[in-house]
Amino acid sequence: MTKKIKALIFDFDGTIANTLPYTFSKIIELAKKLKVKDFKEKEIIEKIRSLSPQELFSHFSISWLKMPLIIWEVKKAQKDLYNKMDKIKIFPGIKKLLKELKKKGIKIYIYSSNLKKNIIKFLEKEKIDQYFENVYVGRNLLGKDKDLINILKKEGLKTDEVYYVADEIRDALACQKAKIKMIGVSWGLAGERGLTKTKVYYLIKKPDEILKLV
């Protein structure tokens, strides 16, 4: 017998908040700083959406020695984002989804690699902070599986009692390692094409489709 889903853990960027335009602009800036050879902006965005981090490094011949610089640039972009949060929009249908999940008694969390202060500011701006039990953030961009496992332990949840709702290929790979079922959202970074190849447990096109899964 399948266990009842008790909780949903949401990613933030590209899942709840539409930070994609900001993200893409920063990716282009980073590509220039990394001196990626013969890159075209359209190609960079396309590959970011369809390849894993490891595949991206290989495709653009980026040395892993550049990782500290990349992490530094990502963190700087996140700090800069704080003052732009007022302009970031929530994806259509998310507010209604959160309200319905709460009615069903589903516990809702956020786990993201963004800064906690950015997330809290956005939740309060959109008046949806009351729906979340807790907001977790991680510092390891490529080690989300360990963080997810630790969150489940802290919250007393088992892997078959929870879904992670997210939009990136690295999220899907982390869920596979952690043995957590992921609901992939087609409106985020990887899109339907990118997530299809990672074999996510469910792939949805609209937020309210989640209600059929819990």
Question: Predicted regions span which residues?
Answer:
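N-terminal helical cap/lid subdomain that shapes the substrate entry/recognition surface
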Residues: 3-92
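Conserved Lys-Pro-Asp/Glu-containing loop-to-beta segment of HAD-superfamily phosphomonoesterases
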Residues: 7, 145-172
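Conserved H-loop
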Residues: 37, 128-133, 158, 201
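A short, structured active-site edge motif that brings together acidic residues
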Residues: 44-45, 128-143
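Acidic, Mg2+-coordinating phosphoryl-transfer loop and its flanking beta/alpha structural elements
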Residues: 163-205
